[in-house]
């Protein structure tokens, strides 16, 4: 009995440590395995004829639900979709799917954030500067650690694969796969979302920063209403986007979405870039497609080569972030050029302003973008 109790305490501690539903379910299964004989003895007589098989079936169903989606089509609002060279959907490589299952992105963040000093050498080897690590440490010390986990909780029953593994495989094994996140509209009391409801929806394209197209961001963008959010990625984890990527939004991604059945309002196409992904905003400003965007939004990234553009520009950053320090002056310069400019700037925030101020930023973007679905 003492041995069982010790094992159970260790398993409960492991259950509390893990963040993902997948590993929490496995810990519960192991606890059940330790006490299965005792549990069987506690069952009423009529239930003993079934044994404990129904409980194992229930655990297996829960485990299956906790695994990332492999189906191309699912009822989830947030999905990771693999695309072939023509922009048509395809199943993800099985190896990438299995690694997604066994090493969920949520657990990588959970271990990295909670054990930052242990993970620091690995993070540094990946090119993350000491300033960013120090800022993360400061946020943790200030009680903001939950901000890094809330987006995963916000995904709810949605359980897409992680977008970073396709990029890791491209870098490490020279594969050439491409995957995007699609976040479908939530709809409101006036318009119930469906692909065939007779409405066209705004499209918000998100370009990630360094270290890849994380699932974490989708738990934030899920709260944008009345729009389709498309999170595209660079082939590697660099987050450096070029004019070619801007062209592909119109020649590759939008046609792909429309073949999937999404109805897009081409007058309401918005582009957002985070950190290194701000390179997409600079590229768009100097692209012939600048006129095709309704707004450009740079998050935690000063813009280079400012110029007058025929669309709105939004700047989001923090005063403790060197990557955002120029935003107030840049907003002023753009306004003097005649560009409608929105500024969300918090002097005491750092490079992680998006996770720390996600609700305020979402409300700011809703106001600036004025996302509305229109009848076809």
Where are the predicted features?
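Gly/Ser-rich "nucleophile elbow"/oxyanion-hole loop immediately N-terminal to the catalytic nucleophile
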Residues: 193-199, 241-275
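Short amphipathic alpha-helix adjacent to the substrate-entry channel of hydrolases
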Residues: 215-231
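A domain-start/cap signature at the N-terminus of enzymes
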Residues: 12-15, 21-38, 42-198
